[in-house]
Swiss-Prot record:
This is Tuftelin-interacting protein 11. It comes from Sus scrofa. Residues 14-28, 91-102 have a biased composition (Acidic residues). Transmembrane segments: none annotated. A motif (Nuclear localization signal) lies at residues 699-704. Residues 1-31, 54-73, 85-136, 183-236 are annotated as: Disordered. The gene is TFIP11. Keywords: Biomineralization, Cytoplasm, mRNA processing, mRNA splicing, Nucleus, Phosphoprotein, Spliceosome. The keyword ATP-binding does not apply. Involved in pre-mRNA splicing, specifically in spliceosome disassembly during late-stage splicing events. Intron turnover seems to proceed through reactions in two lariat-intron associated complexes termed Intron Large (IL) and Intron Small (IS). In cooperation with DHX15 seems to mediate the transition of the U2, U5 and U6 snRNP-containing IL complex to the snRNP-free IS complex leading to efficient debranching and turnover of excised introns. May play a role in the differentiation of ameloblasts and odontoblasts or in the forming of the enamel extracellular matrix. PANTHER family: TUFTELIN-INTERACTING PROTEIN 11, TUFTELIN-INTERACTING PROTEIN 11-RELATED. Pfam families: G-patch, GCFC, TIP_N. Identified in the spliceosome C complex. Found in the Intron Large (IL) complex, a post-mRNA release spliceosomal complex containing the excised intron, U2, U5 and U6 snRNPs, and splicing factors. Interacts with TUFT1. Interacts with DHX15; indicative for a recruitment of DHX15 to the IL complex. Interacts with GCFC2.
Length: 836
């Protein structure tokens, strides 16, 4: 930007007071030389800074100043400007002084309506200033060097898919012709000479921009206020805003006639003008006149030097404000009326819906009144037919049909009515007459169907029920208690407890019909006292009817209610067993039905106190004689195996049987016996015990002890003569018996593991062992023991495994451990203990 002109005023002279001021206004010279790289700059010298305007410059007469201004030529003729009002744009352009046009145009000196008018240019503009100072070559030959090349750019584009004559892009959406440029006529700003759109732009984008439309509309409306230069009186065209457009726009002016209370009380200080003004609502700001402030004119409104001030031709701000206010008030009134109309229409729709609802309510109420009238007629008809002298008395079946009709057709009214009082007045007399001659023990199912029907008609549902024994809330419960219960109470007082079957059958037939609290009342208040009294009178030594025959049938109905009877029963049975001998099997027949009735603890205590001592005495009297054995006493004891626990039975055998049995075996072996007979005798006694008893560790130890005694006998060479093959037979017997024991143990362990897996205890169902090897593997994982096969090692065709530090093999569900000389079978638990 040029700096030399910054030291001169608008006429090109220096100001004494402002010689040190730098003016940064943009001049025409700056605009013309904006892109001129060769423009000359003048830098202020030290002499110019010291002497200011009195400094001598050699180049004052040689080159023009950068400000584009020349000194006035006083030898030129004087041009006079005629006074008067503002003329047309063309005349004003001719009368303007050429010197004024050469002055730099300041930003604040542009006319207010600058835009569509042309820039005023004079004839004194230097032709040399139409181009840059340094000058540049024309662009006509730009790119002419390419004509001597081989067109590599065009070839590259064609390789990438470009087709000549079509646009760029994947879908050829680019423009074909280059963008055309339109040269502006003068030196004004953009838009100063009208539209600058080219022919290509009009073809590609025929739609007119909204800003251009607004400008055209503004010029059209503005021209209506101007006088036609031709003098013809043409009727002006006005554009109107219809009511529909105003409604569609829905604009609500902020200038409300009745502002909100909290907004109207806001204090607003307006400091936009020369003076501070205070308003007490926002609406007052919008109501103020748009009148220019009376003060010094703006810099843009000051007359230019050498020109007269031009007064505005037509300015009535008060009238314009009033007209605008009337327009806005009218728009507000239209919008408010439209809203009020919409509100009234919505109110009409709402009232129509309310009318429909009220009509439905009225119809419902009329229907309810009609139904209540019909229900009342039916009830009155029932009361009339219940009178003593009626020719057509009401029966229970007809009454049930009437109640069914009430429940089916008039369900809401039936639910809302007082069914208790209705049933008491109508149903109860008929029900009493129906059960008048009923005997429950002879015909236990009499009346079950009719009572079941009345249960569905009279019993309250869960929402209306007030409790199990609230007779005032449930008509059916009251019916059973007041009509049915007296007949049952009367028959129970005459009933004999030893004849329990009719009473049990009667209650089983009615247990699903009568209420639960009534059944509890019958069992607790009527049946149990009778049973308790009968148990006190029972004598097990004299009564021929077993007590369980008339007590146990009550178990499904009474269950834990019979617990108080068990203690006196056990006491009476214990007293009866004081002189009992195991040879009498009647005791077992009397006690066996009570095994599952008494609790396990009480049953075991009863057996240990009253039965086990008798069995011990009987077993102590047993004489073991291999040549002539009497087994009656042994059978009497073994017959109680299911009645007493296994531990109690094993205790009896350890104390009273095995000592004598082992003593007889030792005596037999010391007298040169026949080992085949001993083997048969051993196996015969072992077959007398069940698998459950043989699996007990104490019993196994005793039989293993007998095998050890026999092995020592055949190995000690006692006597001069030894039966041939006796040693081998005893060894084979020992091996076979131990093998059976371990097979049984393995089977038991496998069953326990399967049961645990089925119950969900322990391992998951997917990991349940399918064979004995899987079971051993599972146990090894549980105890963190290494279990793996020994590669290339077998014994009798069986794979050898290492279980920790022990070598084992599995044969038909039995684990064999490698001993010092032979393979010894062992149990799984023993194997785990040895591995640890």
């Amino acid at each position: 930007m040029s700096l030399s002109h910054l030291y001169r005023d608008g006429e090109g002279h220096m100001d004494d007071d402002e010689d040190e001021r730098e003016n940064f206004e943009i001049t025409d010279w700056d605009l013309q030389n904006e892109f001129n790289p060769n423009r000359q700059r003048h830098w202020q010298t030290k002499e110019e800074a010291t002497y200011g305007v009195w400094a001598e410059r050699d180049s004052d007469e040689e080159r023009p100043s950068f400000g584009g201004k020349r000194a006035r030529d006083y030898s030129a003729p004087v041009n006079f400007i005629s006074a008067g009002l503002k003329k047309g744009a063309a005349e004003e352009a001719e009368l303007e002084d050429s010197d004024d046009e050469e002055k730099p145009v300041k930003q604040d000196e542009f006319p207010k309506d600058f835009g569509p008018k042309k820039l005023k240019t004079g004839g004194n503009f230097k032709p040399s200033q139409k181009g840059f100072a340094g000058g540049t070559k024309s662009f006509m030959d730009f790119g002419s060097w390419e004509r001597h090349t081989k067109g590599i750019g065009q070839k590259l584009l064609q390789k990438m898919g470009y087709v000549p004559g079509r646009g760029l892009g994947k879908n050829a959406q680019g423009i074909i012709n280059p963008i055309e440029a339109k040269q502006r006529k003068g030196k004004g700003a953009v838009g100063a000479y009208g539209s600058e759109r080219t022919t290509q732009s009009l073809q590609d984008f025929p739609v007119v921009d909204s800003e251009e439309e607004a400008e055209e509309e503004f010029q059209k409306e503005l021209s209506q206020w101007r006088k036609d230069p031709s003098g013809s009186k043409k009727k002006p065209k006005y554009s109107y805003k219809t009511v529909e457009e105003l409604k569609a726009k829905g604009r609500i002016s902020k200038k409300l006639s009745a502002p909100q209370k909290e907004i109207s009380q806001v204090k607003v200080i307006d400091m936009t003008g020369r003076e501070q003004k205070v308003y007490y609502s926002y609406s007052q700001i919008s109501h103020k006149h748009n009148v220019p402030d009376d003060g010094l004119p703006l810099q843009s409104q000051l007359p230019q030097p050498g020109k007269e001030a031009k007064a505005p031709g037509f300015a009535l701000p008060e009238l314009e404000h009033n007209l605008q206010l009337l327009i806005e008030l009218t728009e507000q009134e239209i919008i408010q009326n439209d809203r009020q109309l919409q509100y009234e229409r919505d109110m009409v729709v709402n009232l129509s819906h309310e009318l429909e609802k009220m009509a439905e309510v009225l119809e419902h109420e009329e229907r309810v009144i009609s139904n209540l009238s019909k229900v009342l007629e039916m009830v009155e008809e029932c009361e009339r037919r219940l009178q003593p002298g009626c020719s057509n008395p009401l029966t229970l079946d007809e009454c049930a049909r009437i109640f069914e009709t009430l429940q089916d057709k008039y369900y809401e009214e039936y639910r809302m009515s007082d069914r208790v009082d209705l049933a008491v007045a109508i149903v109860y007399p008929l029900m009493k007459d129906y059960f008048k001659e009923w005997d429950p023990l002879k015909d236990c199912t009499y009346g079950t169907e009719i009572i079941s029907k009345w249960k569905s008609l009279l019993e309250n549902d869960q929402l209306l029920s007030h409790g199990g024994q609230d007779l005032s809330a449930d008509a059916f419960h009251r019916l059973i208690w007041e009509v049915w219960m007296p007949f049952v109470r009367n028959i129970v007082t005459q009933w004999q407890p030893r004849n329990c079957d009719p009473m049990v059958d009667f209650l089983d037939s009615w247990v699903h019909i009568i209420p639960v609290w009534i059944l509890d009342n019958i069992l607790d208040q009527l049946v149990f006292p009778k049973l308790q009294k009968e148990v006190e009178n029972w004598n097990p030594l004299t009564d021929t009817v077993p007590i369980h025959s008339w007590i146990h049938p009550w178990l499904p109905l009474m269950q834990a209610r019979l617990e108080p009877l068990y203690s006196p029963i056990r006491s009476k049975l214990a007293s009866a067993l004081q002189k009992w001998h195991p040879s009498d099997s009647s005791a077992k027949l009397i006690l066996q039905p009570w095994k599952d009735v008494f609790t396990p603890g009480s049953w075991e205590a009863f057996m240990v106190k009253n039965i086990v001592p008798k069995l011990g005495m009987c077993l102590g009297e047993l004489v073991i004689n291999p040549h002539q054995q009497h087994m009656d006493a042994f059978y009497w004891v073994i017959d109680w195996e299911g009645m007493i626990s296994v531990s109690s039975l094993v205790g009896l055998l350890e104390k009273h049987f095995f000592p004598k049995w082992l003593q007889v075996l030792c005596s037999w072996l010391s007298n040169s016996p026949n080992y085949e007979e001993i083997t048969k005798w051993y196996l015969g006694w072992k077959s007398m015990f069940s698998d459950q008893v043989l699996a007990h560790p104490s019993v196994k130890d005793k039989f293993n002890e007998a095998l050890d005694i026999m092995n020592r006998a055949v190995s000690s060479n006692v006597g001069a003569y030894m039966q041939p093959g006796a040693r081998e037979n005893i060894a084979y017997l020992t091996h076979t018996e131990r093998r059976k024991d371990f097979q049984y143990e393995a089977m038991q362990e496998r069953r326990e593991a399967e049961n645990m897996a089925q119950r969900g205890i322990g391992v998951a169902a997917s990991s349940v062992p399918m064979n004995f090897k899987d079971l051993i593997e599972t146990k090894a994982e549980e105890h963190n023991i290494v279990f793996m096969p020994v590669i290339g090692k077998r014994h009798e065709g069986k794979q050898l495994y290492t279980f920790g530090r022990i070598v084992i093999y599995i044969d038909r569900g039995v684990v064999f451990v490698q001993g010092e000389k032979t393979w010894v079978p062992t149990s799984l638990q023993s194997l785990i203990d040895m591995a640890k």
